[in-house]
UniProtKB/Swiss-Prot annotation:
Domain of life of the source: Bacteria
Recorded catalytic activity of this chain's protein: ATP + H2O + a folded polypeptide = ADP + phosphate + an unfolded polypeptide
GO cellular component, one term: cytoplasm
InterPro entries: Chaperonin_Cpn60_CS, Cpn60/GroEL, Cpn60/GroEL/TCP-1, GroEL-like_apical_dom_sf, GROEL-like_equatorial_sf, TCP-1-like_intermed_sf
This protein's record includes keyword Nucleotidyltransferase: no
Residues noted as binding ATP in the record, renumbered to the chain: 30-33, 51, 87-91, 415, 496
EC number: 5.6.1.7
MF term (GO), any: isomerase activity
UniProt GO BP: protein refolding
Subunit field text: Forms a cylinder of 14 subunits composed of two heptameric rings stacked back-to-back. Interacts with the co-chaperonin GroES.
CDD domains xref list: GroEL
Gene name per UniProt: groEL3
NCBIfam families named in the record: GroEL (TIGR02348), PRK00013.1 (NF000592), PRK12849.1 (NF009487), PRK12850.1 (NF009488), PRK12851.1 (NF009489)
The name this protein goes by in its record: Chaperonin GroEL 3
Length: 542
């Protein structure tokens, strides 16, 4: 085992704080409508230009192991916020840096780290409660467009496309973002269904870059039991090979010899095939397979219906224009099922929703209805260069997550104002001791950080902006960094989803609390490279 280096207390915190600062300083310049760009060098191709906080955070790796630990823990804040809310990563990073900095100062002056953390947690809970109580439900399409625009760094075109996509497929529909082949950004809405099962073997992948299986105009075999060998479906497999079309197999499971044979056939190029597990469990699985059959115009191969695998013909297989399978989900686009049958099925599901008394069953039925009736919207992002397209696609992804979050939990005034106003919730908090009170004050100062940073990125003085905002008490009164105007942010369209603001604060406080209470750090000692001995004669030629 290699020798380890151990750092304690102030020394450990100082090194960690240096790492936190490096990562946070690189990420926070992207915050707000006037956020700056960060250029990331790539080992191949052109450098990447981005304003996406989590993309910047993922690129940072420091040489000093102790500093790197601090940076990586802060990176975790950005990643976690991105996973939960899909946006707000830069805000979370700015908040975490502010809490860690203030916390380190308090500990250096002799405060108890555990009490500080308790105070921080108390304050965060109070602020989150205040944010939720001031949330405004989203009702109009224009508000969805505003959320999308803000999250896409002020790009109104992206906001408009997202609002249009959500209007067409509903809040439950599936929206995907792709790179366009032209310089124009466009929206395409396709009838389709997505379920949370991915390919059974990575050998089925056809698009190696995106690790995705793409089948054009495939046949779809829908089977409710396991497939262990292919003997029983050889006749239908041969018929599919003759037709020259790809085949998707949806079954309870495809295992052993059956899976191995399919993989070998795919690799040899004999049959373009992919297999996925059927979605759901028990009776719900049967219902979902029936949904897929109706959508694709196929038949579920089920012993309950008296259909044996040996008797399956091409006519019993479903058809679709395209099937896209990723590691964890499958999308069937433009199924060949008849419109009247699909409408009949959706009416049947709606009736079941009306009748059911179980919240869980209702939720699952609504999911099925959305998959049958919702469809898939594809936003194709265009640009003049590959670099521009990638940067824009990052912003569209952020904006998509933000709009979903806004519909889910409602909206708040944007520009960091909601956090600044929520500071009132900290006034009446009772604490067990003075150290916990300091923890609350740390959060009070930290939640000003996003407004200050947005102002600095826009070329304004943060403390002047904060001072002016404090003069007014209206919750939605704030400063619009894009236009440099003060007023009601709802009216100006500067809004943030509650989920994004809440998640950013909670994740920042969670990781900052861990950093503040760290007393020791252990890392492997760097190996000293020994200089090779010079050859006799010092390399000179006599």
């Amino acid at each position: 085992m290699a020798a380890k280096e151990v750092k304690f207390q102030a020394d450990a915190r100082e090194r960690m704080l240096r790492g936190v600062d490096v990562l946070a300083n690189a990420v926070k310049v992207t915050l707000g409508p006037k956020g700056r760009n960060v250029v990331i060098d790539k080992s191949f191709g052109a450098p990447r230009i981005t304003k996406d906080g989590v993309s910047v955070a993922k690129e940072i790796e420091l040489e000093d192991k102790f500093e790197n630990m601090g940076a990586q823990m802060l990176r975790e804040v950005a990643s976690k916020t991105n996973d939960l809310a899909g946006d707000g990563t830069t805000t979370a990073t700015v908040l975490a840096q502010a809490i860690v900095r203030e916390g380190a100062k308090a500990i250096a002056s002799g405060m108890n780290p555990m009490d500080l953390k308790r105070g921080i947690d108390l304050a965060v809970d109070a602020v989150v409660k205040e944010l939720k109580s001031n949330a405004r439900k989203i009702s109009q399409n224009s508000e969805i467009a505003q959320v999308g625009t803000i999250s896409a760094n002020g790009d109104t075109e992206i906001g408009r496309y997202l609002a249009e996509a959500m209007e067409k497929v509903g809040n439950e529909g599936v929206i995907t973002v792709e790179e366009a082949k032209t310089s124009d950004t466009e929206l395409e809405v396709v009838e389709g269904m997505q379920f949370d099962r991915g390919y059974l073997s990575p050998y089925f992948v056809t698009n190696q870059d995106k690790m995705r299986v793409e089948l054009e105009d495939p046949y779809i075999l829908i089977h409710e039991k396991k497939l262990s060998n292919l003997q029983s479906i050889l006749p239908v497999l041969e018929a599919v090979v003759q037709s020259g079309k790809p085949l998707l197999i949806i079954a309870e499971d495809v295992e052993g010899e059956a899976l191995a044979t399919l993989v070998v056939n795919k690799l040899r190029g004999g049959l373009k095939v992919a297999a996925v597990k059927a979605p759901g469990f028990g009776d719900r699985r049967k219902a979902m397979l029936e949904d897929i059959a109706i959508l694709t115009g196929g038949t579920v191969v089920s012993e309950d219906l008296g259909i044996m695998l040996e008797n399956v013909t091409l006519e019993m297989l479903g058809r679709a224009k395209k099937v896209s399978i990723e590691k964890e989900n499958t999308t069937i686009i433009d199924g060949a099922g008849s419109k009247t049958e699909i409408e009949g099925r959706t009416a049947q599901i709606r009736a079941q929703i009306e009748e059911t008394t179980s919240d869980y069953d209702r939720e699952k039925l609504q999911e099925r209805l959305a998959k049958l009736a919702g469809g898939v919207a594809v936003i194709r992002v265009g640009g003049s260069t590959e670099v521009e397209v990638k940067e824009k696609k990052d912003r569209v992804d952020d904006a998509l997550h933000a709009t979903r979050a806004a519909v889910e939990e409602g909206i708040l005034p944007g520009g960091g104002i909601a956090l600044l106003r929520a500071v009132n919730a900290l006034d009446g908090l009772k604490t067990a001791n003075d150290d916990q009170r300091v923890g609350i004050e740390i959060v009070r100062r930290a939640i000003e950080a996003p407004v200050r940073q947005i102002a600095e990125n826009a070329g304004a003085e943060g403390s002047i902006i904060v001072g002016k905002l404090r003069e007014k008490v209206e919750f939605s009164y704030g400063w619009n960094a894009q236009t440099n105007e003060y007023g009601d942010l709802y009216t100006m369209g500067v809004i943030d989803p509650v989920k994004v603001v809440r998640t950013a604060l909670q994740d920042a406080a969670s990781v900052a609390g861990l950093l503040v209470t760290t007393e020791a750090m252990i890392a492997e000692k760097p190996k000293k490279e020994s200089t090779p001995a010079l050859p006799a004669g010092g390399g000179m030629d006599f």
